[in-house]
Amino acid sequence: MGITIVQKSNLEKPKRNPKIALVLSGGAVSGGAFKLGGLRALDQFMVNRDVRDFDIFVGISAGSVIAAYLANNVSVEDIHTSMIERKGPLSAVKPFEFYSLNKADILKTPLHILGDLASITSRKVFGFVSANNIFRKQFRRQLYAFATNPSSASLEKFTSYCFERKELAVNHPSLPWHYLPNGLFKTDRIERATRRNFDRNALCNNFNELFRKTGKELYIVAMHLDTARRAIFGHDQDNTTLITRAMQASIAFPLFFKPVSIDGTDYIDGAVIKTTSMDFAIEKGADLVICYNPFRPFNHESFDENNPDGRKRISIARDGIAAVINQVMRTMLHTRLMHGIKHYRDNPDFKGDIILIEPTEHDDRFFDLNPFSLNDRRKASTRGFESVSNSLRKNKADLKRILAAYGIKARPAMT
C-alpha cells in the first residue's frame, strides 16, 4: 500500500484548534516532482482545506523548496504549473542553473597537486641538504668510514644514513583523496533563481517575517557537516539566514552538490541525517502529521504479484550500478522512516496521528526515473498524482474518519 497510518488519538473527542503539520522529505528532482503530483491529489481529496492551510511545514532536501512556497501561501497548482509545465507565476529552475559545474574546485585540483609537489620537493631538498653537510659530526663519521674503506657495505650504510633520517619525513596523505573536488555541481544558481521567484512574487524570505505575517511555522532541515548533527532553520530555531539559503543548504546532496557554507559553517542535504524529521514536527506540537516520502525501495516480488499487464523485469543487479545505487539509497531512507513509524506506533505517550504517503513498493515506472534528470519531471509528477489518488481511494474510509476529527472533509468520490 502507498499509505501507512498511525492512529493514536481519540477521534471521538477531537482537540480544539489542533495543529496539522506537513512534512516533506527529499527525493531529488524526480522525488520533488512526484511529491507535487501527489500533493495535487491530496488537495483534490480535501473539500474544505488545501495543503497550504496547514500550520507547520517541515522541509528536507527537495521537500524544503516545496515547503517554502506552501508556507508562503503559494498553491500546489501554481507550484506545479510553474515547475512542471513551466508556464506559471514562478520561474522553473533551468538546466544551466541546476547543473552548474563546480568549476572553481575542479580547476584548482591541478594547481593543488603542483603546489603540494613543489612544497614536498623543496622540503625534501632542504631536509637533505641540512641533514647531510660536512659540519655535522655524524655525517663526517659516515663519510670517513666509506672513504677509508670503500665497499658495497659501507656505501649502503652511508646512503641509508643520508636518505633515512627523520628530518626527511614529510606529512602528506597516503591516498590523495583531498585532491578530488567536494562536489561535481554547486547550488548557488539554484538559490539565486529561487530568490528571484521570492522577490518577484513578494514572498517572505525571512523566517521571522513569515511567521509574523502568516502564523505559519516553516522549518528547513540540513546537516552540519563537521559535527554530523541535524541543523534546523526556522523562526524559533536558527533564523539568521534567508529561507532560500537554508533551502540551498538542505538540498546539497553529497558528492553531486558541493557543501554549502553559511557564516563559516558547512551544510549538506538534511536527508543524510533524518529521512523526514517527523519527530521535530511532533515536538513543535503537531497533533496530525501528514508526511510524504517519495523514495521507497522497489520490491520485485510485489511487482510480479501486482502487474496486471504481465510485464517482465530483469533483476536489479542485472540492471546496472545505477539501479543498485537507487535501490540502496531508497532502502536506507525508507528503513529509517519505518523505524520512526514503529516508534510512534509503540510509544504510549504519543497521542497524535500520522498519515504517511509513499509510492507503492511495486511502482517500477517511478523507480526507473533518473532522480537528477530535469527531463523526467512531468513523468514523475504524473506518477505521483496517479499513485496518491489510487492510495487515497483505497484508504478512503480510514482517512475520512481521521481527517474529520481535524475538521477536514473528504471528497465523496475521486476521479
Predicted regions and their residues:
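Catalytic cores of secreted/periplasmic lytic hydrolases that degrade extracellular macromolecules
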Residues: G63
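Patatin-like phospholipase
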Residues: M1-I60, A68-T415
